[in-house]
Amino acid sequence: CISARYPCSNSKDCCSGNCGTFWTCFIRKDPCSKECLAP
């Protein structure tokens, strides 16, 4: 999986980068969805 850190406050907008708390966004190969977890 490819992981990247984005500033966000919850898993819903993890990859949008609009919030202050850093989460880790994992882009899963299958089913090609984004799963966001706390660091």
Curated annotation (Swiss-Prot):
Key words of the record: Disulfide bond, Knottin, Secreted, Toxin
Q: In which tissues is it expressed?
A: Expressed by the venom gland.
UniProt cross-references to InterPro entries, sorted A to Z: Spider_insecticidal_peptide
GO CC terms in record: extracellular region
At the top level, the lineage of the source is Eukaryota
Q: Which residues form the signal peptide?
A: none
Cellular location(s):
Secreted
Q: Which cysteines are joined by disulfide bonds?
A: C1-C15, C8-C19, C14-C36, C25-C32
According to its UniProt record, what is one Pfam family this protein matches?
Toxin_21
Q: Which GO terms describe its molecular function?
A: toxin activity
Q: What does this protein do?
A: Causes paralysis to insect larvae (H.virescens). This toxin is active only on insects.
* Domain-level remarks: The presence of a 'disulfide through disulfide knot' structurally defines this protein as a knottin.
Write out the similarity annotation: Belongs to the neurotoxin 13 (insecticidal toxin ABC) family. 02 (Calisoga) subfamily.
- This protein is called U1-nemetoxin-Csp1b
